[in-house]
Structure formats: C-alpha cells, structure tokens
Amino acid sequence: MSDKTMKDIQAEVDRYIGQFKEGYFSPLAMMARLTEELGELAREVNHRYGEKPKKATEDDKSMEEEIGDVLFVLVCLANSLDISLEEAHDRVMHKFNTRDKDRWTRKEEGK
C-alpha cells in the first residue's frame, strides 16, 4: 500500500488511458459509466446493510472494489476536463468549513 496523492492518482490514470488510441470517453459517456458504477456500489451497500440479501447465484464483490471503480471513472472524468481533484477538494472543504461551520453540533475537544 502506498501513500499516493490525488495528483499521483490522476497522473497514473492518465498514463494508463494514454496508451490507447481511443483515449478518454466523452464526458457524457463517462457520466453514464459513473452512474453505472455508482449503481453497482449502491447494490453492494444495499446487500450488506439493507434488507435485500444477495441471490445465491450472485458474485460476492467487495465494497473496496466498487469504490475503486467509482474513483477510477471519476478520475477519468476529471482528467478529461482538466480538473485537478486536489484543487476541487480544497475548494469544497473551504466551502464546508465556511458555509457549514455552524451547521452541525461539534464534539468537545479531547473527546
């Protein structure tokens, strides 16, 4: 297991996609793929934590694998649109730390 930054992950995915003539799919096609992968993750969550058990004939996929699939497609989408996920993360955390700073009940420090 390595400590990869989001920048490292984006570069690794870009190198992988870059070896194929087809390159990145269109943003619309990647949104369809992302929706598909999110559906597969939702199915796993539902089977593990919901009321709907798997059929005996269904493969047992891991949550880690499904989250990895979602991450891969999200990175592809960001790369194709030239979006730094580190910068996007920083912006959203700033938003949460300012807009939502008093929205939730904070834990007492030291607990």
UniProtKB/Swiss-Prot annotation:
- Which residues form each disulfide bond in the chain? none
Origin, by domain of life? Answer: Bacteria
Q: Name one Pfam family in it.
A: MazG
Kindly state the subunit structure of this protein: Homodimer, or homotetramer.
PANTHER family per the record?
NUCLEOTIDE PYROPHOSPHOHYDROLASE (PTHR42692:SF1)
What is the protein name stated in its UniProt record? Uncharacterized protein YpjD
Q: Which organism is it from?
A: Bacillus subtilis (strain 168)
The gene is ypjD
